[in-house]
Amino acid sequence: METENQKTMEESTKRKEEKKKRSRVKQVLADIAKQVDFWFGDANLHKDKFLREQIEKSRDGYVDISLLVSFNKMKKLTTDGKLIARALKSSSVVELDLEGTRIRRKKPLGERPKDEEERTVYVELLPKNVTHSWIERVFGKCGNVVYISIPHYKSTGDPKGFAFVEFETKEQAAKAIEFLNNPPEEAPRKPGIFPKTVKNKPIPSLRVAEEKKKKKKKKGRIKKEESVQAKESAVDSSSSGVCKATKRPRTASEGSEAETPEAPKQPAKKKKKRDKVEASSLPEARAGKRERCSAEDEDCLPPRPKAKKRAQKDGVGQAASEVSKESRDLEFCSTEEEKETDRKGDSLSKVKRKHKKKHKERHKMGEEVIPLRVLSKTEWMDLKKEYLALQKASMASLKKTISQIKLESEMETDCKAPTAGSGQECSTQEKVSAQGPQFVTGVIVKIVSGEPLPGRKQVKDILATISEVVYIDLLEGDTECHARFKTPEDAQAVMNAQTEIRKKHSWNLEVLSGDHEQRYWQKILVDRQAKLNQPREKKRGTEKLITKAEKIRLAKTQQASQHIRFSEYD
């Protein structure tokens, strides 16, 4: 009985789990249908070359559902072909075949509409990482959005900051321009973003720019806070100074000590301040002193002439009255400042409250004001033409300056070469370099080492101390290499110094001759031909001009950085 009860309990739990597992696919089915209807819609197929070609390839216009599963947007929704077929059963744009594995358009694709540009608007000043759904939500208030294009950078994948939105009718596009064109005050006056990027080079990420902006803002806030704190501390110090002066009564003996000639001299401003503080301390201590020291005035104060004493007393009285006035003014100012700061704080808080209230009201009403610049695509096309014309003119001027620089450099070289003989020598050298190295016997030295040889430069530097080296044929990590010299005499000079080289570097040297020499010369010619036949990256148009200008700029900077050495006779 117990076993039967356990079995029934297990079955009931399994049924409950099965019921819980029931997936809710209503929203997913709706999203799949919407996405496929968009892909096979007129607006997308006129622009989507790949999908149009796939439809044209098949005889009856059917496309396999597995192709749709390979798309990234469909992967996010589902990878189940049956679920896609289930979602497209009630579609108004596409239809399934009998097996339910392929789909096609119900109506054939017509010609591309002529008013496409008039129905499209250009949008800039978009938020970073903008999405199609966000644009559809914002522009959907003005009409039915048919197509959205958000250009991205190939290297980083970041959006370029602008987009194109196509509406169903011209009126809807005009409405979007009227209601959504609200550019902020900081925005540039002239619309149209035409970002210039270097080909195959990464673009600095948007995060870096954001971080820089944040750092700048933080610095500005810190500076403001510091200035406010400094002002407050200055006010506090001035008020505390006055309070200290009134609290601490200084005796006449302290005053007399300060006025002795032994004390170091101070500037006039400091003296005045000190006198004021002393004066403020004296009147409070006076009342008590009159009672106590009426008879003992002579003991309290140092012996001085009577006239001086009277003058000092008068001065002290005036100073005391001035200080008391100043202290009152300070207190009044401080209270006024506090009141002003309180008023400002209240006003700021009120403004913030009002702003929040308005924002909430807008959200309730659905009137969200977004700082965007919206204009028609035809207007944007005119701006693009203007930009291209400017670019063309600037490139033409750059080309002109490059040609002028070339002419100037040629003129300089002509001035430097006055004799005809030197010119002939140069021409012969150019011909030789064009043809390649000519066969000369006894100029190639083979170097063999027990260990891997150092770099090409190091080997060349070692041999160059004995005679001039033309070329070193060496690959990294090799134990053998070939050194080509200008003349057989140079090669022989190296062979004569073989014993010294062997002691220092443990290299074995040998001059090539006979078949070995001929084979090596053939190898030289083959390697040279292979190098010349290598495919080179062709640079055309603006890219070619910019690279030329960059080379000239680098050459000029190098020339400017060189030291000018004057001879004794200059």
UniProtKB/Swiss-Prot annotation:
Domain RRM: 119-197
Major site of localization recorded for this protein: nucleus
Observed effect of gene inactivation: Embryonic lethality between embryonic day 17.5 dpc and birth. Conditional knockout mice lacking Larp7 in germline cells show defects in spermatogenesis: males are sterile, whereas all females display normal fertility. Cells show reduced 2'-O-methylation of U6 snRNAs and defects in mRNA splicing.
Biological process according to GO: box C/D sno(s)RNA 3'-end processing; cell differentiation; germ cell proliferation; mRNA processing; negative regulation of transcription by RNA polymerase II; positive regulation of G1/S transition of mitotic cell cycle; positive regulation of protein localization to Cajal body; positive regulation of snRNA transcription by RNA polymerase II
Cross-link (Glycyl lysine isopeptide (Lys-Gly) (interchain with G-Cter in SUMO2)): K231, K406
Ranges of biased composition (kind: Basic residues): 213-222, 350-363
GO cellular component terms, A-Z: nucleoplasm; nucleus; ribonucleoprotein complex
Database matches in SMART domains: LA, RRM
Descriptive protein name: La-related protein 7
Record organism: Mus musculus (Mouse)
Lineage of source species: Eukaryota, Metazoa, Chordata, Craniata, Vertebrata
